Swiss-Prot record:
Name of the protein: Proline--tRNA ligase
Enzyme class: ligase
SUPFAM superfamilies registered for this protein in UniProt: Class II aaRS ABD-related, Class II aaRS and biotin synthetases, YbaK/ProRS associated domain
NCBIfam families: PRK09194.1 (NF006625), proS_fam_II (TIGR00409)
Domain of life: Bacteria
Family per similarity comment: Belongs to the class-II aminoacyl-tRNA synthetase family. ProS type 1 subfamily.
Catalytic activity: tRNA(Pro) + L-proline + ATP = L-prolyl-tRNA(Pro) + AMP + diphosphate
Gene that encodes the chain: proS
Length: 572
């Protein structure tokens, strides 16, 4: 590609509304242009990267034996009503009616459509296992789109769905997909972790996320210092403390605390160690229980894990915090004065709270706290559960090492759906025994557009993007110095351009009448990994200058060795 025939569209300045590095650089490098909130035009440079990501994803899906199909973005609402997700999904699901007043949605995912397809096309266990995939546009009406294509409303996704007669068959495909995803992200050149994850609105049982490590990530991922254990913080187990509860050293006593409405204020005003405090959170109780609210207690320096709490049998799902009015009507005190002593509703305490002694908590009387509380002596131990987020330094759940926490960008997610959708939508096949059985399902997603942003978050410097070779928009840039004044430079550049193209190398030839500084800046900004600089002075010695974008290494290459050297660098 010649720059004179290309829409390069680079920018010197960063647009004011760009927040994270990938958003800034994708705009400056001319990869995307904003059309509306969460909607982007993909420009030529961006599309080149996107297509290379797609190619790798498609190749590895084909290697698993998955079969490519394409399903509509527009989906009938009755399929979503049939699966039960019409009400569950919420406002992210864009709903509309056609001219015949028939309701439809813009698909944020395709479980319903694929299940409908399979129940009409597959009738026998002999046709299973079967895995189908597509690379298709999705739409989620995000309440606050941000970070460019990292959290946009419209995005490109690879979604695969597998269908099985047995759980054993599903597990085999799930394991194969796990390996395929690992190969995809390794080939692309990402530093990633596969972590245990919650199934969320998709549903199902087992689930793994593939997280790219990046400071701008929205997820906290947890992994051990001494083993392969890794999990999303939502799912990471906070193991019970190894030590027993200490012997009480003080009596429980009531303290006036009119200006201490938060744990931070209590700690500051009364010189309490924060690990000697307990915070009490009120949530709605599950239907069928004898109480309207449930109290959840965690240590003052810990945070409630809402995903864990929501899975407790006494807690309503989705988790809903009580209003101040609800709390006052039942407890008789405001949110800043709640605690376990004389509490008129059931309580569930975290494992770390169960081993506390001589601790402070609200007295369930406005502007008062009890200090010196001890379990069993002052009140019975309530139900104990793991309901907090882990923190760095916690013991790893597998007993090996301690936990580290890093930020991550989710680029892939695999699920064992089981029969959630096939049962709801009556997708059955005739089994070996001649009777109909519900099909068992798995689903496997990759955020193709998000991969592009995640790769930039991991690969950039103050001059621009540093693409891994596998997904660079161009593998090699040819920069001829003063080509329009030197016939020799032009002749060498043209020949090298032709030779590289003939070798199947993706090359951009900067044939503009521009200053060298502009040419270098643009190629560094868009992240071309390998640059060849051609100038009269070096040609006197039969050489050109080679520069590697990632390490800034420069070296002189003989003209007759340039193509072979670049092919070696690129692994061609």
């Amino acid at each position: 590609m010649r720059t004179s025939q290309y829409l390069l569209s680079t920018l010197k300045e960063t647009p004011a509304d760009a927040e994270v590095v990938s958003h800034k650089l994708m705009l400056r490098a001319g990869m995307i242009r904003k059309l509306a909130s969460g909607l982007y035009n993909w420009m030529p440079t961006g599309i080149r990267v996107l297509k290379k990501v797609e190619k790798i994803v498609r190749e590895e899906m084909n290697n698993t034996g998955a079969i490519e199909i394409s399903m509509p973005v527009v989906q009938p609402a009755d399929l979503w009503q049939e699966s039960g997700r019409w009400e569950q999904y919420g406002p992210e699901l864009l709903r509309f009616v056609d001219r015949g007043d028939r309701p439809f949605v813009l698909g944020p995912t395709h479980e319903e459509v694929i299940t409908d397809l399979i129940r009409n096309e597959v009738s026998s266990y002999k046709q299973l296992p079967l895995t189908l995939f597509q690379i298709q546009t999705k739409f989620r009406d995000e309440v606050r789109p941000r970070f460019g294509v990292m959290r946009s409303r419209e995005f490109l996704m690879k979604d695969a769905y597998s269908f099985h007669a047995t759980q054993t068959s599903l597990q085999e495909t799930y394991d194969n997909m796990y390996e395929a995803y690992s190969k995809i992200f390794t080939r692309i050149g990402l530093d990633f972790r596969a972590v245990l994850a919650d199934t969320g609105s998709i549903g199902g049982s087992a689930s793994h996320e593939f997280q790219v490590l990046a400071a701008s990530g929205e997820d906290d991922i947890v992994f051990s210092t001494e083993s392969n254990y890794a999990a999303n913080i939502e799912l990471a187990e906070a193991v019970a403390p190894a030590h027993d509860r200490a012997v009480p050293t003080e009596d429980m006593h009531l303290v006036d605390t009119p200006n201490a409405k938060t744990i931070a204020e209590l700690v500051e005003q009364f010189n309490l160690p924060i690990e000697k405090t307990v915070k009490t959170l009120m949530v709605h109780a599950a239907e069928g229980t004898s109480h309207k609210l449930i109290a959840l207690l965690v240590r003052g320096d810990h945070e409630l894990n809402e995903i864990k709490a929501e899975k407790l049998s006494l807690v309503a799902s989705p988790l809903t915090f009580a209003t101040e009015e609800e709390i006052r009507s039942i407890v008789g005190a405001g949110p800043g004065s709640l605690g376990p002593v004389n509490l008129p509703i059931p309580a569930i305490i975290d494992r770390s709270v169960a081993v506390m002694s001589d601790f402070g908590a609200g007295a369930n009387i406005n502007d008062k706290h009890y200090f010196g509380i001890n379990w069993e002596r002052d009140l019975p131990v309530p139900e104990v559960a793991d309901i907090r987020n882990v923190v760095e330094g916690d013991a790893s759940p597998d007993g090996k090492g301690t936990l580290l926490i890093k930020r991550g960008i989710e680029v892939g997610h695999i699920f064992q759906l089981g029969t959630k959708y096939s049962d709801a939508m009556k997708a059955t096949v005739q089994g070996e025994d001649g009777h109909n059985q519900i099909v068992t399902m798995g689903c496997y997603g990759i955020g193709v557009t998000r991969i592009v942003a995640a790769a930039i978050e991991q690969n950039h410097d103050d001059r621009g993007i540093i693409w891994p070779d596998a997904i660079a928009p161009f593998q090699v840039a040819i920069l001829p110095m003063n080509m329009h004044k030197s016939y020799r430079v032009k002749e060498v550049a043209e020949k090298l351009y032709a030779d590289l193209r003939a070798s199947g190398i993706d090359v951009i030839f900067d044939d503009r009448k521009e200053r060298p500084g502009v040419m270098f800046a643009d190629m560094e900004l868009i992240g071309v990994p390998h640059t060849v600089v051609i100038g009269d002075r070096n040609l006197d010695n039969g050489e050109v200058e080679y520069k590697h974008r990632r390490n800034d290494e420069k070296q002189m290459l003989k003209l007759d060795n340039v193509v072979d050297y670049l092919k070696q660098q690129l692994g061609c």
